[in-house]
Amino acid sequence: MKVLMFGWEFPPKIYGGLAVASYGITKGLSLQGDMETTFCLPKPCGDEEKFLNIIGMNQVPIVWRDVDYDYLKSRLSTSTPEQYYAFRDHIYSDFSYMHVNDLGCMEFAGGYPGNLHDEINNFSIIAGVVARQQEFDIIHAHDWLTYPAGVHAKLVSGKPLCIHVHATDFDRSRGKVNPTVYAMEKNGMDHADCIMCVSELTRQTVIHQYHQDPRKCFAMHNAVYPLSQDLLDIPRPDHSKEKVVTFLGRITMQKGPEYFVEAAALVLKRTRNIRFVMAGSGDMLDAMINLAAERGIADRFHFPGFQRGRQVYEAYKNSDVFVMPSVSEPFGIAPLEAMQCGTPSIISKQSGCGEILDKVIKTDYWDINAMADAIYSICTNPSLFQYL
């Protein structure tokens, strides 16, 4: 079976959990033997693994240009002249009014720029060229950013569309939904033949908030791959005198970072032998630094910034407790990664991963007293640490 997949992130360029999930799914499909995946990205870096076919949408022409073969070889970093010409033969409309480069291709910033909605629209236009040129059996679109591309590919090809709901705007916004994003999400769901949700929690949101037929909505939980030996060999420091409690993720409203800081303040009223780490970046970072200072715990708080690759697992190994106090977490793969590293986890009851995890402590995200009790208990009770 051939899958035409649309995604917005892919390792080694990681902006969040979407890249990790996209990698895991495509890697798993590649091991099936009878699956061939073509993954469309706005702007590949060229260092992606080669177990799947990657199409850089920034190197697919939408305006016809008479370009020399040798010039193409020098200009195309992640594609070939042959592929360029094949796509050029399937340009389906006059897009000369669009802003394109000398190859007739659209440029993408990559990631999540200020003109994100423009890039989503451009991505879907290019998807029309790709869907006309490629041979495939099914379309798979990851998250709202690529739903328009998936819908366009379905309308062009008539092939079934599976959308993968990693999160909804209800999760990201605490209910203050962006109507434009909601409309894109609902349009993708309405056109989808199958809706894959990362948890039953998310499935219920899709059914009730987006008014979808339960018969086409399925909960498909995320998972993690076994760690490589070099990551398993990362040593755990001796924290017999001073424990380390870590929050690792985007420092945004959805992730509940303020509840972590407030719980830390309660714990530090009982003992000063614990350090707290808030690793990540986001629009609430400065506010959390200020909140830690206001609570008088800045000397016990560390903000190391965004962690990549091996740094993530070093952070887990360096922790005695991992805390994920998300307000609304469709799944949340970080606790699974922490547990792989032998680090006990505390998660909010509003997290989808709680549906499959037993040996974790679960509290309501807003219950900072329960969260503080759990942190203190794990840090002071070696038996509980070993059990978890």
Q: Each PLM stretch: what is its role?
A:
Residues 360-369, 377-382:
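Conserved acidic donor-binding segment of nucleotide-sugar-dependent glycosyltransferases
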Residues 35-131:
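A conserved catalytic-core segment of Leloir-type glycosyltransferases
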Residues 327:
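Aromatic "clamp/platform" in nucleotide-sugar-dependent glycosyltransferases that forms part
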Residues 196, 238-264:
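Conserved donor-binding/catalytic core segment of Leloir-type glycosyltransferases
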Residues 287-307:
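Nucleotide-activated donor-binding/catalytic signature segment of Leloir-type glycosyltransferases, i.e.
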Residues 344-347:
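Short hydrophobic beta-strand element within catalytic cores of glycosyltransferases
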Residues 201, 223:
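Carbohydrate-associated surface elements
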Residues 306-307, 314-319:
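Short alpha-helical donor nucleotide-sugar binding micro-motif in glycosyltransferases
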